[in-house]
A protein has these predicted regions:
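A polyanion-binding, active-site-adjacent surface
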Residues: 1-273
Length: 273
């Protein structure tokens, strides 16, 4: 059996992953630095036409060592499928590390050293790919991208920018009581539907024809796309690419929960049963 996999980090990205900011830049009271940095997902071979800028890695990303593989990743992958993209994309996050605690994400988005490293990635990706569109997921990503656009390198970018509502906005907004989950999902999908025509027009040669099927008022199974094996490190099992959540932080107190991730193989992926 032949299985595709992410080949790793060629130049110039090898220099970026070798020289990443540590706890002296990302404070431990705001980020889960103990789990290490998580850099990207997608193509680093110069073939990307779309750049996705996310927020920060969550539980599943921490295990898989690539960004946007959980719920947000499945929804984002589905959006790329609607755009006709199966390979020609690349993704980075606003933050290298998972955010810890209330307010840390907003407090640190403009920290000079955090921003400087993030902007090195954005500059390298856009310099070494024919990026026609940038999709920012949520307000933090839009803020980070706008800040990069104000730099000399960013000012030279002439592609499309689609500022999208974050893929897990329905869960976060409804949990805080701002809005019902159904209403929040409808708002999200209206935002995504509105962005699709301009982004599609900016991509002259998608990997396959765009689906032409807009979102409805809620996500359906057809709107979610499994993470491609070629986006993940060699050897990760196929069930880590699917829509089911297989990892969760566990513990009786905040410190234990921060230090512990429990991974469970889904029942239908247990060959001994």
């Amino acid at each position: 059996m032949t299985t595709d996999f992410c080949p790793g980090y060629p130049a110039p990205y090898d220099g970026l992953v070798a020289d990443y900011p540590d706890v002296s830049v990302y404070p431990a009271d705001g980020f889960r630095v103990e789990w290490g940095p998580i850099f990207h997902r997608g193509r680093l071979d110069g073939s990307a036409s779309v750049l996705v800028l996310g927020q920060d890695p969550a539980v599943l990303e921490t295990v898989a060592r690539r960004i946007l593989v959980g719920t947000a990743g499945q929804r984002t992958q589905g959006l790329l499928t609607k755009l006709g993209l199966t390979r020609s994309y690349t993704m980075v996050n606003t933050y290298l590390y998972s955010v810890w605690g209330q307010g840390a994400a907003d407090r640190h988005v403009n920290d000079p050293l955090i921003a400087a490293y993030r902007e090195r990635w954005l500059t390298a990706l856009i310099a070494h790919n024919d990026i026609r569109a940038v999709l920012t997921l949520g307000t933090l990503a839009a803020t980070a991208f706008t800040a990069w656009r104000a730099t000399a390198d960013g000012a030279a970018f002439t592609g499309q920018h689609a500022a999208l509502i974050h893929p897990t906005y329905p869960e976060s907004a409804s949990a805080s009581g701002q809005i019902t989950k159904a209403e929040a999902t409808k708002r999200l999908l209206e935002n995504w539907n509105a962005a699709i025509p301009a982004v599609s027009a900016a991509i002259p040669s998608p990997d396959q024809p765009p689906t032409g099927v807009p979102y409805g008022d809620d996500f359906t199974a057809a709107d979610l796309t499994p993470i491609p094996a070629g986006d993940l490190p060699a050897g990760l099992p196929a069930w880590m690419r699917g829509a089911r959540s297989w990892g969760v932080r566990t513990g009786a107190d905040p410190d234990t929960k921060r230090a512990t991730i429990t991974v469970t193989v889904p029942p239908d992926a247990r060959p001994w049963m």
